[in-house]
Amino acid sequence: MGRKVNPIGFRLGIVHDWESKWFAEKDRQYREQLHEDLDIRELVHRELPRAGISRIEIQRAVNRVDVTIHTAKPGVVIGKQGANVERLRQLLESRIGKKVHLNIQEIRKPELDARLVAESIAEQITRRVSYRRAMKHAAAAAMRAGAKGVKIRVKGRLGGAEMKRMVWEIVGRVPLNTIRANIDYAVVHAPTIYGQIGVKVWIYHGDVLPEARPPIAAGVVAE
């Protein structure tokens, strides 16, 4: 039976870029660096659970790791006089044993970020807010912010029902088969007393041609 491919993985190298950018010469080195990446992401999300972090990009030099944190709340990540970001850098360096540079990149429109939208819906479902209301408000906010289309799916024992079911909220168009379409995608799970509720979000930002790809913006660097 056919399955839908991940929209971000389907467009890597065309519209989207990799979140880990490094090269390993040996299999053992690859395994070690892969586990370091997993540790870095797990530690950042654990230390900053409410910082509105969408994604974490990792690049490597010889004895240095550059970590870019994309967040909707840069003030929470940086902290008063940089206290939080300095503490996070020290924790990362003690965990992986290498020098770490932190780059904080602000997400100016969180309504257009699929990960943040999915987390917001999941949090509302956990707090027993109506899932239909949360979906409609999230889709409307994304369209007001400039999205070309939004698709939201929640699945599970909605409202405590005996059998699981699936509910969709679709606004505009989301062309999943168009490779040049810039589609953001995220999956989040909402824990409830009835079990896990799955939340999927697709946000269509329009088509992106190779010459029109946005440049990488610089952020705040902590060394």
Curated annotation (Swiss-Prot):
Signal sequence range: none
CDD domains reported for this sequence: KH-II_30S_S3
Keyword vocabulary terms for this entry: Ribonucleoprotein, Ribosomal protein, RNA-binding, rRNA-binding
GO CC terms in record: cytosolic small ribosomal subunit
GO biological process, one term: translation
UniProt entry tagged with the keyword rRNA-binding: yes
GO MF term set: mRNA binding; rRNA binding; structural constituent of ribosome
Annotated Pfam families: KH_2, Ribosomal_S3_C
Domain of life: Bacteria
Plastid as UniProt keyword: no
Annotated ranges, domain KH type-2: 40-108
Self-association and partners: Part of the 30S ribosomal subunit. Forms a tight complex with proteins S10 and S14.
PANTHER family assigned to the protein according to its UniProt record, in alphabetical order: 30S/40S RIBOSOMAL PROTEIN S3 (PTHR11760), SMALL RIBOSOMAL SUBUNIT PROTEIN US3C (PTHR11760:SF19)
Annotated family: Belongs to the universal ribosomal protein uS3 family.
Protein task: Binds the lower part of the 30S subunit head. Binds mRNA in the 70S ribosome, positioning it for translation.
Protein name (record): Small ribosomal subunit protein uS3
Gene: rpsC
